[in-house]
Amino acid sequence: MKALASLMIIAGISIACTSTGTERKGSVPVGVSDTIAAKAPADKGKQAPAASMISDRRAKGGTLNLAFVGDIMPGTTFPDSRLPEKDGATLFKDVDSILTAADVAAGNMEGALADEGETTKKGGKFSYSFRVPTRYGKLIADAGFDFMSMANNHAFDFGLDGVKSTEATLHSNGIAYSGIGGRKESAIVERNGIRYGFCAFGHNSYTLKHADQENVKRIIGNLREKADIVIVSFHGGAEGTAHKHLPQGKEMFLGENRGDLRNFAHFCIDNGADVVYGHGPHVVRAVELYKNHFIAYSLGNFCTPYGVNISGISGYAPVLQLTVNAADGTFVGGKINSFIQQRGKGPRRDPLNLVAKEIRSLTNADFSNPKLTIANDGTISKR
């Protein structure tokens, strides 16, 4: 997945905190690092990274190819074993060619990567608690993922020990991560001379909260000073098929404030983010072009073969491909690749492109003047 440490040394790459693993996505060595805290810009202004950090590729222009998915929970051993066929060996067989072809690919780790421990949730074994075997970290890496959000309502299913196990597993497989309050607030992934800055926000007490605008602005500002492209992930919104439409204002669910997601996404872009992608409702939602930057409000359930409802539209599992300008992160084009989950098997091709058509329908319904056109095959273009 990532270049071996020796190759990184030969290439002369010096990164603060490096993850290594098998190499992929071309022959260029890559690095994953913590983001060092820095002063946030006073306001948006799309502040450029420091001159010493601007890559030649960005300075020369060109485009970048990004891939995004929703929730990933490949299988659980709690309270009993519910694991996919062939121990997950074929989970990503229909999607890995898209993910590995992207410059970077990102998703949401919906659960703890851990081999032991008891849930800390009320209800014990009767709660929705997901304990994914740590060996599945390699499957996720081999599928092509570079970053995982941990800012969700299942990251703490097995307490701090589960969080630490998840972080260690992702790190050992060369996958960057962020999203838990008081721990790693952002990450930088370098690919082919481009620095991608990632951060993740949620609504739970232990996450970096999307309701804390001052902190959101600070974190994005820090990344803006160090990265060529800034990508924000969020977990939020009410859950279930009754909540597939994107409302105005705050969303309340199970007594929790799940966020004012339109306002949050716009705030992120206003303060320097290039792309914003979401997950949490367990269904897909609309997409938006805001100030020429792309927002996906929910990419639904991507790989949740057990433990999560995947019937009907709950099983819609898009892989969103975006092409953005390297110079400023603005939208060039994209595609919604349609997949539908199969119980115990993972995402499989949707020959009717029902997923793309659903996102198109939601986009046209939830925005009075959408600035995007989505074709039957999922191709996304500006109006």
Model-identified regions with their sequence ranges:
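Bacterial N-terminal signal peptides
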Residues: S6-S14
